[in-house]
């Protein structure tokens, strides 16, 4: 899970990936009461925000509530999946939804995620450049802040000599060919690399497209920990806290 923090243990916690879901129960924390409810409802999937398992276990003996939950889940064939900091850090994730619910405007990430962006460079015949760009954008490339379809394009010439066994889009076997091409540069989240490459290979007319991937040190301002924003109208601290308690249906604050 590429957006989770290093300390986290999000993802599949208990169960088989090929299990067919009969129903899903959402919760903040996995407890025995949550598992009992899932069993009573006939649901075999529990999706929690906080992971049940954070540390490694050398034995499972039921000595604490976590081990009790592990044993109960396994005994009743319940799959447990947790989406924690990967959901917190996601663009438009948990923090953005809370900010929207409490009426914040001009919302932006408090601590942007680093080492999560990649630059893609590829070279495409001029006539097919637009089709390839569209395919890359559709696969998740080209988003910078509140802008999408971002790319940089330079015209130039590419050369190649097709060998026996190849099926060149242009040029002839055994002859050096020069083709007018466009160098396309764009950015993408690193976790979308596989689907972007698949889209590139599908849209590119060459049977052996040339492309480069470069890791970037730029922070991804759309993803990260926490958000900050402004209130539409000023409030005192007490007024704000009372409104938060009511809006989020909290018992304590």
Outline where the language-model segments fall.
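Hydrophobic structural segments
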Residues: 1-252
